[in-house]
Amino acid sequence: MGYNYFEIIAGEFEMTDIHFIETSGEYKKLGDSARIWSSGTWDVSLKKANSLIGGRIFLHTSQKGPSFLCGEIIDVEEATTGRVTFIFRHDRSLVNTLVGENDGNWGQEQITVNR
């Protein structure tokens, strides 16, 4: 699942959230469930993506804009080398989340935030 067993036991486990600037419109609902979504493909290594399972994904239209689609990451799929698709369970209560000024710096299209 991407969790480090020893960090959990030692009480040092932090969940990591990932935020993306979504401009391609590749995200989509999967099947008949309104809650399971695919994020579209992102420039994230498979190793890093797997470590994010259990964390949360947030899609934004801009760095300063609120999230519009978000939820708990439940799986990842390798799309192409170095790119992955996140499968997540939508959580309406997370919509309109902003990235705080103290959360770090955005890369070109993403930022990870420990919580």
Predicted regions and their residues:
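Structured alpha/beta reader/binder surfaces that contact nucleic acids or chromatin modification marks
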Residues: F6, E12-R115
